[in-house]
Regions:
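Beta/alpha (TIM)-barrel catalytic core signal, keyed to glycine-rich beta->alpha loops juxtaposed to Asp/Glu
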Residues: 1-119
Length: 119
């Protein structure tokens, strides 16, 4: 499921979790070549500065803290290492800020267009 702070799909995640269906976030970092760029979001940058981590690490940790798996794509060894260093916490207030950015941006085309959850 395409899932990141710009497309949190709260209803779909809640539906799945209420039925013990584990959710895996596809494209959890958004898409670097598309606008708006999640990794340039000012609110997420503030949280990253606060916890001393990269924006990508904060976004991945946000996904994990929500109870989802994240599968970021990278071809760079240094990013692969960075993406696995998620041994920090994001406080509740910052989790809520990230969860409510309100952008609603889908980066991956919705081929099925099911519209099940109106998101």
């Amino acid at each position: 499921i395409e899932l990141h702070p710009y497309l949190p799909q709260h209803a779909l995640v809640s539906f799945c979790q209420s039925r013990d269906i584990h959710v895996t976030a596809y494209s959890p970092l958004g898409s670097g070549g598309s606008k708006p760029c999640l990794l340039e979001d000012e609110e997420v940058k503030k949280v990253a500065g606060k916890v001393g981590k990269s924006v990508a690490q904060v976004v991945l940790k946000w996904g994990i803290e929500r109870g989802t798996s994240v599968i970021p794509k990278t071809v760079k060894v240094e990013r692969l290492k960075e993406n696995s260093m998620l041994d920090f916490d994001i406080d509740r207030e910052d989790m809520e800020k990230i969860s409510s950015l309100g952008v609603e941006k889908r980066y991956v085309p919705d081929f099925w267009n099911s519209g099940c959850f109106d998101e």
